[in-house]
């Protein structure tokens, strides 16, 4: 029988034969099939460049339903099975049509029979439910492979060397021996009564306002808290090897940061409190009204964010060591040595984090960001409250970080005692800012004063030598305090 496939009009595929010329041929834009144009240039690696569709001879795009076919035959076969169309197909030429890329759209029955003849599998065509299940399985497999890859990458990350383990153990022991109440702080803490920090705010002569009772409670724990920070630093060999001048500068720069960090890691989300010095649990408003102002917000925010990291004692200890060995302190002598020490702690810190295998994605860079947050948020919050641009805290004339304050004595001490009552009962020098003091600055003054008193611990001086070195009321002599301390430490 003579075949005239180009004139066959029965059984056309409506989805592939939407536009035809008068002679029955399908119109093609720019002489190309739209599907072929969309797949132009794509050849799977397992196909030869000129591989042909086994059904129609057009350019193949891959394995589809167990055969190498083009996109057109793949779609035709899938639609036929999914919609169960093959029983409706018919052919006017006794199913003897020749199927090629020109005639494939003119006889659906012959095209479908050829699909079956070349081996296309009907059972591989999925219905909607099976297709959804397959996609879900694919996503599950991708997620499983992603987790396996993450585990492999964690296993391949370097862990601490024996030398780094020694550094880690020393820092951890230094932290534990100077951390008040240790891991039992929740059981031993005492909540500051609700009425403290909520009483009427007292206006100071310079216009600032503070709750004197809360302020008094906080000043009681500052000196022992600073003592523990100094003791922590002295237990680190790299710190003890530095000149006395650099030790003092580093302690002045990091003391508030380390104290804030120690308070932040003891944030309790259930009671929304911070435990100061391991013993006093305070609420945000109590800390704010007690003298720290907006700085209290920074510490509470830090505590909330750190609670998700679940840091252990070693990580807190190493974070403190990194804060201590910071080269951005003004006036340092051995900058290179301090920088190398910080790098050693950073490497040990990173390798210890790898050893713990945290489940938080990108744990290490996130933790480094928190380290910078500890340094910046406390100072910038305080500076913002005082109206200083850029968060730039004042610098002592000697280049030490004295928060823009000078040591004073005499009548000014008695004036502060009259203002603060018990909180103003200050033995030794106190601090006076060159400009009107904010409440949080007053607390920082006490912090700094205690730091001067404990600088003797760094250089091994006794109380009498410290008292004599700070006895002058002249501002010119005040600037020589740290030189005097350093000179005594160097003398036999």
From Swiss-Prot:
Which GO terms label this protein's molecular function in UniProt?
Answer: chromatin DNA binding; DNA-binding transcription factor activity; DNA-binding transcription factor activity, RNA polymerase II-specific; general transcription initiation factor binding; intronic transcription regulatory region sequence-specific DNA binding; nuclear receptor activity; protein domain specific binding; protein homodimerization activity
Q: Which UniProt keywords apply?
A: Cytoplasm, DNA-binding, Metal-binding, Nucleus, Receptor, Transcription, Transcription regulation, Zinc, Zinc-finger
Zinc finger regions typed NR C4-type: which residues?
53-73, 91-115
Sites where the protein binds Zn(2+) 2:
91, 97, 107, 110
- The NR LBD domain covers which part of the protein? 163-407
Under SUPFAM superfamilies, the record lists:
Glucocorticoid receptor-like (DNA-binding domain), Nuclear receptor ligand-binding domain
Which residues lie within the region annotated Modulating?
1-52
Residues annotated as DNA-binding are 53-127
Intracellular or extracellular location(s): Nucleus
Outline the segment boundaries, as ranges, of region: Disordered. 1-33, 457-492
Enumerate the InterPro entries for this protein. Answer: NHR-like_dom_sf (IPR035500), Nucl_hrmn_rcpt_lig-bd (IPR000536), Nuclear_hormone_rcpt_NR1 (IPR050234), Nuclear_hrmn_rcpt (IPR001723), ThyrH_rcpt (IPR001728), Znf_hrmn_rcpt (IPR001628), Znf_NHR/GATA (IPR013088)
- Binding of 3,3',5-triiodo-L-thyronine occurs at 228, 277
Domain-level remarks: Composed of three domains: a modulating N-terminal domain, a DNA-binding domain and a C-terminal ligand-binding domain.
Subunit arrangement?
Answer: Binds DNA as a dimer; homodimer and heterodimer with RXRB. Interacts with NCOA3 and NCOA6 coactivators, leading to a strong increase of transcription of target genes. Probably interacts with SFPQ. Interacts with C1D. Interacts with AKAP13. Interacts with TP53INP2. Interacts with PER2. Isoform alpha-2 and isoform alpha-1 interact with TACC1, but the interaction with alpha-1 is weaker. The interaction with isoform alpha-1, but not alpha-2, is decreased in the presence of thyroid hormone T3.
Q: Which family does it belong to?
A: Belongs to the nuclear hormone receptor family. NR1 subfamily.
Q: What does this protein do?
A: Nuclear hormone receptor that can act as a repressor or activator of transcription. High affinity receptor for thyroid hormones, including triiodothyronine and thyroxine.
Recorded protein name is Thyroid hormone receptor alpha
The organism named in the record is Rattus norvegicus
């Amino acid at each position: 029988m003579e075949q005239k496939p180009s004139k066959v009009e029965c059984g056309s595929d409506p989805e592939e034969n939407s536009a035809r010329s008068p002679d029955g041929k399908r119109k093609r834009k720019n002489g190309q099939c739209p599907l072929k144009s969309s797949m132009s240039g794509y050849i799977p690696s397992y196909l030869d460049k000129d591989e042909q569709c086994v059904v129609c001879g057009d350019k193949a795009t891959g394995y589809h339903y167990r055969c190498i076919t083009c996109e057109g035959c793949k779609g035709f076969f899938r639609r036929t099975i999914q919609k169960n169309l093959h029983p409706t197909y018919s052919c006017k030429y006794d199913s003897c049509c020749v199927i090629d890329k020109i005639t494939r759209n003119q006889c659906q029955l012959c095209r479908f029979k050829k699909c079956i003849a070349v081996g296309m599998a009907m059972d591989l065509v999925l219905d909607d439910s099976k297709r959804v299940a397959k996609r879900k399985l694919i996503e599950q497999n991708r997620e499983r492979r992603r987790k396996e890859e993450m585990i492999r990458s964690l296993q391949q990350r370097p862990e601490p060397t024996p030398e780094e383990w020694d550094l880690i153990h020393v820092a951890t022991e230094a932290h534990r021996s100077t951390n008040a109440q240790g891991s039992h702080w929740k059981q031993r803490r005492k909540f500051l009564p609700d009425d403290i920090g909520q009483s009427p705010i007292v206006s100071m002569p310079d216009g600032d306002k503070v709750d004197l009772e809360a302020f008094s409670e906080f000043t009681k724990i500052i000196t022992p808290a600073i003592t523990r920070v100094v003791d922590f630093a002295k237990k680190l060999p790299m710190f003890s090897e530095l000149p006395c001048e650099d030790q003092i500068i580093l302690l002045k720069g990091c003391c508030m940061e380390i104290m804030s960090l120690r308070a932040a890691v003891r944030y309790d989300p259930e009671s929304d409190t911070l435990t100061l010095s391991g013993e006093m649990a305070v609420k945000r408003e109590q800390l704010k009204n007690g003298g720290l102002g907006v700085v209290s917000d920074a510490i509470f925010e830090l505590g909330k964010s750190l609670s998700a990291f679940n840091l252990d004692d070693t990580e807190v200890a190493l974070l403190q060591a990194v804060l201590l060995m910071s080269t951005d302190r003004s006036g340092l002598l051995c900058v290179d040595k301090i920088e190398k020490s910080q790098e050693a702690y950073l490497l040990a810190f990173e390798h210890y984090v790898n050893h713990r295998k945290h489940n938080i994605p990108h744990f290490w860079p996130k933790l480094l960001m928190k380290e910078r947050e500890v340094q910046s948020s406390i100072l910038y919050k305080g500076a913002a409250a005082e109206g200083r641009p850029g968060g730039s805290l004042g610098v002592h004339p000697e280049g030490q970080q004295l928060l823009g304050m000078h040591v004073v004595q005499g009548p000014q001490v008695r004036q502060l005692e009259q203002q603060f009552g018990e909180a103003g009962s200050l033995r030794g020098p106190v601090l006076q800012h060159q400009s009107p003091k904010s409440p949080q600055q007053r607390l920082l003054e006490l912090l700094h004063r205690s730091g001067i008193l404990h600088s003797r611990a760094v250089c091994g001086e006794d109380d009498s030598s410290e008292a004599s070195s700070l006895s002058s009321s002249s501002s010119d002599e005040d600037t020589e305090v740290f030189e005097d301390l350093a000179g005594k430490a160097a003398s036999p």
